[in-house]
């Protein structure tokens, strides 16, 4: 299952980190987030929810999830997922990541600048300032997302639950 990391809610403004958690569910369950590298859906998804090149790492999956949700797509976790994205090696073998200082020195635009632009883009998405085709849809609202997720992205707070 993919969910928000409780220790990283609104870590950088409106951005919250996600985490994948293995579960022992035996049934298909509703989901509130998605992993960009593990999307199984109809082929028209890439036209309905095109990849937004204005994101660099942080924000891309949340943006896609919110755009898909507001365009009427639903997410599900299935038992016995046939693949897994191993982002961090469990044996703790060090490896370079894209924000490695040595590599970052060689870039025309630094990781920190790309990160700022990504997070600003996410804020613009929440404020409905992003134009088609990268905008939020009209089938569901961010308020609808708050109801199912318990996270109010507009006010950067957990939503009170009754």
Task: Give residue spans per PLM region.
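Generic recognition of cysteine residues
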Residues: 38, 152-155
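Catalytic cores of eukaryotic secretory-pathway lumenal/extracellular enzymes that build
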Residues: 1-64, 70-124
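C-terminal domain-closing interface element
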Residues: 109-153
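Conserved small/polar residues in nucleotide/adenosyl-binding loops
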Residues: 155-162
């Amino acid at each position: 299952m993919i969910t928000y990391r409780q220790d990283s809610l609104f870590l950088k403004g409106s951005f919250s980190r996600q985490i994948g958690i293995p579960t022992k569910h035996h049934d298909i369950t509703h989901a509130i987030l998605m992993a960009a590298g593990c999307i199984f859906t109809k082929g028209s998804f890439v036209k309905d929810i095109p990849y937004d090149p204005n994101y660099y790492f942080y924000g891309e999956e949340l943006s896609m999830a919110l755009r898909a949700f507001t365009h009427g797509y639903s997410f599900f976790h299935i038992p016995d997922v046939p693949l897994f994205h191993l982002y961090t090696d469990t044996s703790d073998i060090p490896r370079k990541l894209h924000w490695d200082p040595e590599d970052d020195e060689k870039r025309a635009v630094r990781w920190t600048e790309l990160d700022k632009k990504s997070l600003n883009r996410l804020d613009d998405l929440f404020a409905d300032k992003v134009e088609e085709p990268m905008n939020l849809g009209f089938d569901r609202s961010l308020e609808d997302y708050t109801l199912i997720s318990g996270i109010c992205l507009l006010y950067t707070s957990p939503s009170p639950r009754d």
